[in-house]
Amino acid sequence: MSDFSSRFCAARRACIARDFAKLNPEQRRGVLTTEGPLLLLAGAGSGKTTVLINRIANLLTYGRGSDCGEVPAGASEDDLAFLENYPAQPTADERRRMRQLCAVEPPAPWQVLAVTFTNKAAKELRERLEAFGIAGAGDIWALTFHSACVRILRRDIDKLGFSNDFTIYDTDDCKRVVKDILKEMDLDEKTFSPREVLAVISKAKDELLSPQDFSKKWAGSGD
């Protein structure tokens, strides 16, 4: 990397970091890391969600700018001097120029997927993103794992030959269906426990077995 490139990248990172000056050093490190996977290990109330929200803000504003070694085509010595001497209280035009110089392939809000475990946590995440003032925050996919997958399936499952108008069954629904099938086949629930039947079906799904493959597997097992 040339002296110009290394200085430009250092100045760019410093300018971006100023947007997150209120965070502590470890939080800021997580926010500014954009390349590759990142694991945050911290206790309750230590600011993990704060890091996540600020990291999304960084990605949407600056893309990979804080963590890459690329210099924009046409970057000049004047641009470098501007970043290295970026004022403490910039004007709106200066701030706009800084963001243009520092941004590297920022994604659109709808390209960001923020997955959490509960509906309550997903709702809080969406509310905090909107309160943060991120443009287009409503388009960010801040969802639970299940709701994210359902949204994808509703949109694209027809490409696999299935209907988009499907119904999701919970555990009780599944047990009821298995019980109905056992009754229809005149099989004793004490011998074929619905819970055990569901466990076998779940294992087959994990192994990506089709109903036909599953039938062949058990037909040859002797059980």
Which functions belong to the PLM regions below?
Residues 1-163, 168:
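P-loop NTPase Walker
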Residues 34, 117, 137-140, 158-223:
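ATP-hydrolysis module of ASCE/P-loop NTPase motor domains
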